Amino acid sequence: MRLNKLISGLGLAFAIYFFLLNQERLFGEVFVVADEMQRAALLTLIVAYSALASVERLNPFRLVLVPFILIVSSDITFNSLLSHGYPQYFVVYQSVRGYIAIFSGSFAFSYIRFTDKPLYQSLISATSLGIAGLSSYYLFSYLSEVFGLPSLALPSLALFLILAVTALSTAFEGEVFQWIRSERTFLMLVLFILTFYTLAIKPQLSERPGIADFIEWSIVALTFIKISRDFRRSVEVDEREFIASHVPKERVFRDRLYSELEFGEKAFVEGGSKVPLTIALVRALSNVEAPKLAAILAPLISYEDEKLPALSFPWERRIIESRNRRRREKVVERIRAEVMREVKDFNR
């Protein structure tokens, strides 16, 4: 239990309570208007949040309280604006309050790890992100209509659909799904560029439609080229050339080889480091012909961990890291079987 977080939460709750009760005495004016129910709800939620955060097992579920804290804080803020003579903001807030609650709640749910089963966890988070995208679409559509500003409804919906699709792909293994996850950052960057272009640059080119068309098609073409290139990209390693330079000329005592192999396997499985295991295997198989040695070590040399996508969710990192560990264990098992066939009495 991390008491510092609980103490911090209690301190923050006390500071807010003290300010709300004594603001007129301290500043000569009431800035924040909150009734007893709102004060009690806000302080209780803050203390509950810090209590959940202080317990490691319950820490992820603290995010469930975020939308409630946001709504209560927003209620107090806009009630204060209403009491200070800004009713228009209060009216707008009341119209979008439901969308804000749904958006914050679903977005918070997407970060929580509910189960260790990748498929179910990915479905829960992807569904939450989809709901967050729809609520943000309606929220920005309404705000754009009320204030007469350019709408961010479609970009916000597209952003959460990108997050939902890439999060859902975490449930599946394979090159295609790994490629989908790896494109998250690029797709979000393209979305940002298109949004900035549509809102800031395109209106300035209304009298030059040819330039606008050229820019739009250039963005589409570059995006297609980048995505298709990433999908087809593969890295080939010349194992024979790598191994030939590491074949030792002297035999090493068997006990030392076992120790080096065990250390190399542990370093690779737990940390993903190939070097200790590669060197140990090359030394152990010093009498094996280079082509055969290259074939044995090919799975290790060509192995690459699946990279974590940018802005990855905590549960998503856990799934990918666990999957990488299982893949490394399979590589070690495969190599060990080959070594046992090549080296007589290898398994003592």
UniProtKB/Swiss-Prot annotation:
Transmembrane segments: 5-22, 37-56, 63-85, 90-112, 119-141, 151-173, 186-201
Predominant cellular place of this UniProt entry's protein: membrane
Subcellular location(s) per record: Cell membrane
Keyword Cell membrane tagged: yes
Keyword line: Cell membrane, Membrane, Transmembrane, Transmembrane helix
Recorded superkingdom: Archaea
Membrane topology, from the record: Multi-pass membrane protein
GO terms under cellular component: plasma membrane
Stated name of the protein: Uncharacterized protein AF_2401
